[in-house]
């Protein structure tokens, strides 16, 4: 270990504490890269010419997902994809990851993300999401990695006072999961203020759905899905009898809640745009961007779009509203369009088409075991 956070390359050149490579060809560490959004982003990084290292502990993912990424990417691109088994909660694991090679930037997906689980197990969420991220950042600073794209969430808007949600809106959190994201946004602002060389982009996702057009990678939740589209998908393939619709008395066009659904491929492209912004903007500081379509879709509109895409009727069961659910949440996308040059390309029909393609090819996700929940 040399002073200033650099490490010595095999040829003796000091690396890791300067600018490093910029843009395509740069080395990117992706935490949680075997997950739903992670796999789609890793694939796009490879297609854009980046060298990618994934660190994952497979808590909510499987090795097969990365095998599928390699299959889609092909041998030439996959030669630039490495994997290191590791857990962000372990400082030793983070040391191992950063001692292995130099990274020009980090995209940080790893973390727990189920709202209900976070309410039941808040300690687990703080240990994984907050403490794990602090371990990651400590390793980054030790080894001179100064750029990070952080996976935040629209949950930081809490119950929005108005829609669309604008990046400078009042922030709040309604559950431990959302609180961990809010805590980490503040953490990154503060550590960046203390180290002006750090470049941080916070990406606030809305509701990612869909899958890669190949149908070879997609969302594969363990147990009962927490999100709407995976649940609809499981009803469509016969794994669940019906879809519970929570509330049909909202003041919306059909009585069901409105959300901003975004295609996971658009979301992956948003990460590429954010990464390129970090490389191009030395004085960026710490900046937040929404990633959504800017359009709200009701629950019943999603059901109808999926029925049309799949040709399957989705039985529904009307249930009371869930406490804390918002009537309407969707993004303002002006800032991302203006500053990142990014906007969503796919509509709800595209999202449902690609989700169904994934479901048809993989009715039980990455597992061939039809006995799984």
UniProtKB/Swiss-Prot annotation:
GO terms for cellular component: cytosol. Its cofactor is NAD(+). It catalyses: UDP-alpha-D-glucose = UDP-alpha-D-galactose. Pathway: Carbohydrate metabolism; galactose metabolism. The active site is at residue 177. PANTHER family: BIFUNCTIONAL UDP-GLUCOSE 4-EPIMERASE AND UDP-XYLOSE 4-EPIMERASE 1, UDP-GLUCOSE 4-EPIMERASE. Catalyzes the interconversion between UDP-glucose and UDP-galactose. This is UDP-glucose 4-epimerase 3. It comes from Oryza sativa subsp. japonica (Rice). The lineage of its organism: Eukaryota, Viridiplantae, Streptophyta, Embryophyta, Tracheophyta.
């Amino acid at each position: 270990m040399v002073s200033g956070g650099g490490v010595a390359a095999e040829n003796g050149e000091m690396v890791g504490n300067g600018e490093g490579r910029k843009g395509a060809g740069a080395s990117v560490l992706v935490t949680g890269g075997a997950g739903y959004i992670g796999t789609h982003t890793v694939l796009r990084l490879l297609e854009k010419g980046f060298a990618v290292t994934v660190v994952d502990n497979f808590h909510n993912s499987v090795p097969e997902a990365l095998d599928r990424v390699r299959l889609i990417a092909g041998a030439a691109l996959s030669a630039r994809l490495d994997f290191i088994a590791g857990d962000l909660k372990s400082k030793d694991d983070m040391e191992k990851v950063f001692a292995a090679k130099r990274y020009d930037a980090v995209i940080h997906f790893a973390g727990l993300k189920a709202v209900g689980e976070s309410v039941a197990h808040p300690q687990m969420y703080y240990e994984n999401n907050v403490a794990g991220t602090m371990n990651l950042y400590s390793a980054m600073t030790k080894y001179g990695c100064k750029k990070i794209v952080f996976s935040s969430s629209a949950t930081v808007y809490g119950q929005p006072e108005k829609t669309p949600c604008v990046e400078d809106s009042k922030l709040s959190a309604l559950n431990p999961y959302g609180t961990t994201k809010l805590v980490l946004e503040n953490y990154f602002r503060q550590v960046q203020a203390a180290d002006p060389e750090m470049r941080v982009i916070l990406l606030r996702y809305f509701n990612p759905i869909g899958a890669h057009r190949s149908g070879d990678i997609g969302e594969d939740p363990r147990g009962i899905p927490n999100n709407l589209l995976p649940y609809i998908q499981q009803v469509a393939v016969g794994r669940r009898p019906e879809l519970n619709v929570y509330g049909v008395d909202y003041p919306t066009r059909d009585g069901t809640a409105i959300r901003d659904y975004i295609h996971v491929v658009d979301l992956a492209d948003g990460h590429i745009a954010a990464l390129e912004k970090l490389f191009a903007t030395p004085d960026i500081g710490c900046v937040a961007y929404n990633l959504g379509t800017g359009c709200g879709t009701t629950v019943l509109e999603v059901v109808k779009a999926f029925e049309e895409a799949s040709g399957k009727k989705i039985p529904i069961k009307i249930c009371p509203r869930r406490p804390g659910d918002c009537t309407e949440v969707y993004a303002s996308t002006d800032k991302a369009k203006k500053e990142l040059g990014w906007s969503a390309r796919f509509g709800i029909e595209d999202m449902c088409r690609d989700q169904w393609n994934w479901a048809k090819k993989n009715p039980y996700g990455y597992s061939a075991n039809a006995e799984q929940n």
